[in-house]
Amino acid sequence: MGLWDVDKIEYVGRAKGPKEDFAFHYYDADKVVAGKKMKDWLRFGVAWWHTFNQELVDPFGTGTAHRPYYKYTDPMDQALAKVDYAFELFQKLGVEYFCFHDRDIAPEGDTLRETNANLDKVVDKIEENMKSTGVKLLWNTSSLFTNPRFVSGAATSPFADIYAYAGGQLKKSLEIGKRLGAENYVFWGGREGYENLWNTEMKRETDHIAKFFHMCADYAKEIGFEAQFLIEPKPKEPTLHQYDFDAATAIEFLRNHDLTDVFKLNLEGNHANLAGHTYQHEIRVARESGFLGSLDANQGDKLIGWDMDEFPTDLYETVAVMWEVLQAGSIGPHGGLNFDAKPRRTSFYEEDLFRSHIAGMDTYAAGLLVADKMNQDGFIQDLMAERYSSYDSGIGKDIDEGNVTLADLEAYSLDKPQSELIAATKSDHLESVKATINNYIIDALSEVE
């Protein structure tokens, strides 16, 4: 059976009934949906930090997780052992990608030189496993937020020595990405923001991080690292206010600092909620602006105001996400769905690592099937066409084509009575729209055998 006491997870469809929990009911990797295999639409990835390092602690209690590699007490021995466990889990789940922070995979030494040596040993083993299994690196990144040195940020730190250290750490991380063939490279600024504006030079800090990003882009070009760079927005936590607040803020930052040719966005569901948005909103903003890069698949609890990193089980949300992906044609140029999620503290058995990923993978596969059915029927397209039909001719067409002035609009409107203006509006029938989406969910999934 291997290192994990779990068999390879297979697709069974709906034939074995809803209670079969160690199998995929909807994720059929090679099933063709909208012209591509399901696995190529979804491109699932496993997050190293939550899956192999998360001990399931919370602010009120110690970890509950049972993990087989805890028998290795030496940090380096455990780090090397995790590589074997990780790649067996990838294969048993049928997941073709993974993601990690540099400090996830190897323990830190006292100096950057010592830490880099530790990284090299683990990366050697990861590279061997990648070659033998065919599993690929969706993206890597650098942890510039966990160590106390980054208490006031990394590339926005008021302390130049810390900024310099962060640059050295990034250099090594980019080299690892190049070596392992990472398809993307993510920047998440957990400490890049402020706690209080009274002691913060905001423009200076954002200029500093822009310079940092330009240095990273220059070095990637120098070493031939062609991964897509991604910024991951989050409004807060751990910092009171983070500079990459949401998709719109991050895009504006990129435009202001001449970084639009280098970066796209990696968007996360729970981060969208913390910013007061739906996940679909953030994806729509990025998609329509040309900045959709990759997705972190998780969800938050709508009643709790912090980052829960739950595995995605909200089918309505995954339908919305996959609808946006279908309109885009892919999850960015090289993106995927990375499960930036952890089992609940009460789901602490080894097998729960598999159960949780199965739940997330099936929920996104189901979302894809429903979104595809809606897309084939043209339901949303027809809805949009009808709602905006007044712009197909007359004054509306002139507005769309930029052929009118304010004076033209005034002349058109001056003598129109209120009754005519009210008559020009139409009901959205919004409740029926939502009910129809529910019907599509039921109908599309009932067709799965």
UniProtKB/Swiss-Prot annotation:
Mg(2+) 1 binds at residues 232, 268, 296, 340. Its EC number is 5.3.1.5. Its cofactor is Mg(2+). Binds 2 magnesium ions per subunit. The active site is at 101, 104. Signal peptide: none annotated. It is an enzyme of class 5 (isomerase). GO terms for molecular function: magnesium ion binding; xylose isomerase activity. Pfam families: AP_endonuc_2. InterPro entries: Xyl_isomerase-like_sf (IPR036237), Xyl_isomerase-like_TIM-brl (IPR013022), Xylose_isom_bac (IPR013452), Xylose_isomerase (IPR001998). GO terms for biological process: D-xylose metabolic process. It comes from the Bacteria. The keyword Cytoplasm applies. Gene3D superfamilies: Divalent-metal-dependent TIM barrel enzymes. It is found in: Cytoplasm. GO terms for cellular component: cytoplasm. Homotetramer. Belongs to the xylose isomerase family. This is Xylose isomerase.
